[in-house]
């Protein structure tokens, strides 16, 4: 149920005044279709652990993938069968089939076949190609044939998430000789995340989240991370009990061109005649011109070392007298050169 909130209460400050990373960086040094290292910073203290652990659980449990769910082997009625001229018994073959990693390029389940003549190993790559099924680990051995017999099997490939025990499958849907298999659907093989400190200006009390993801190749690591974030977002939306647009502050309708025409933008911040404390804070933050200053938000200014609410109010009052405000985007504005400043 949507709750009405008093518009006079600036509840938006709860999320507006938290620092937020602009993007997720990808470490390209070892990046591949199966491995990715991602860096997200800066985050508020404690947020890296919260986000890192939440995404890790979702990555391992909820990202969908494809797996073999049933097998029908010619000459075998059940999983305890031993087959002539096959080194492994059916139970061992089933264990090997569980490790086959696949990519399913359609929504419906698919049936694929193996027809391999011995002697020699039968590998995942011997599965007859299909337009919708792609084998990711083709060298994976399924069994070994000791004669020139032909090994024939029919496999069912389905979508799913997490782990599905064989006994959970509907027995009424199985045909004679069709054996259900424990299915490992998750395409994510390994996840590791590290939380360290991040610096913003002179402050180091922020978090840095470094994520390493390894997949089976059916899903790219960056896509798996994106899907997990989407799942988390969808699950959390239900907790927001107010109209988000109604509580956001009104954006001042100021055209960029009008702002850029303001003559004060090219003036040095010394012209503001600030207090010594405020002036030193701007100098330490490498804010030299008023055009630099107005592009900073309230939140960014308050993160500056030794810069407090009193200094912020002082600056906002002076900018208001110039018909300027903080948090303005100036596209195409560049700080004047030394020669221009002298003129």
From Swiss-Prot:
Record's subunit section: Homodimer. The RNAP catalytic core consists of 2 alpha, 1 beta, 1 beta' and 1 omega subunit. When a sigma factor is associated with the core the holoenzyme is formed, which can initiate transcription.
E.C. code: 2.7.7.6
Pfam families reported for this sequence: RNA_pol_A_bac (PF01000), RNA_pol_A_CTD (PF03118), RNA_pol_L (PF01193)
Region span, Alpha N-terminal domain (alpha-NTD): 1-243
Notes concerning its domains: The N-terminal domain is essential for RNAP assembly and basal transcription, whereas the C-terminal domain is involved in interaction with transcriptional regulators and with upstream promoter elements.
GO biological process assignments: DNA-templated transcription
Transcription found in the keyword field: yes
Name assigned to this protein: DNA-directed RNA polymerase subunit alpha
Assigned GO CC terms: cytoplasm; DNA-directed RNA polymerase complex
């Amino acid at each position: 149920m949507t709750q009405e909130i008093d518009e006079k209460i600036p509840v938006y400050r709860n999320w507006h005044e938290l620092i937020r990373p602009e993007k997720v960086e990808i470490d390209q040094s070892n990046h591949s279709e199966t491995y990715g290292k991602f860096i997200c910073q800066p985050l508020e203290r404690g947020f890296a652990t919260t986000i890192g652990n939440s995404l890790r659980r979702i990555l391992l449990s909820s990202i969908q993938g494809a797996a073999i769910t049933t097998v029908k082997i010619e000459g075998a009625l059940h999983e305890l069968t031993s087959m002539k001229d096959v080194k492994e018994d059916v139970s061992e073959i089933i264990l090997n089939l569980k490790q086959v990693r696949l990519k399913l390029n359609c929504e419906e389940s698919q049936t694929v076949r193996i027809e391999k003549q011995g002697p020699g190993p039968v590998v995942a790559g011997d599965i007859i190609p299909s337009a919708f099924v792609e084998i990711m680990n083709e060298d994976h051995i399924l069994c070994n044939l000791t004669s020139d017999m032909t090994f024939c099997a029919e496999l069912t490939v389905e979508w799913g998430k997490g782990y599905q025990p064989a006994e959970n499958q509907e027995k009424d849907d199985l045909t004679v000789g069709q054996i259900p298999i424990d299915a490992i659907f998750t395409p994510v093989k390994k996840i590791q995340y590290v939380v360290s400190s991040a610096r913003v200006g002179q402050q180091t009390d922020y978090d840095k989240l470094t994520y390493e993801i390894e997949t089976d190749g059916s899903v790219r690591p960056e896509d798996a991370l994106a899907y997990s974030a989407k799942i988390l977002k969808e699950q959390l939306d239900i907790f927001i009990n107010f109209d988000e647009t109604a509580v956001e502050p009104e954006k001042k309708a100021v055209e960029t061109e009008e702002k850029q025409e303001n003559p004060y933008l090219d003036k040095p911040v010394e012209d503001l005649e600030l207090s010594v404390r405020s002036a030193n804070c701007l100098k330490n933050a490498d804010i030299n011109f008023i055009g630099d200053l107005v592009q900073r938000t309230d939140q960014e200014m308050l993160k500056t070392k030794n810069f407090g609410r009193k200094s912020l109010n002082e600056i906002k009052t002076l900018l208001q007298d110039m018909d300027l405000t903080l948090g303005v985007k100036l596209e195409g504005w560049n700080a004047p050169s030394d020669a221009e400043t002298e003129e």
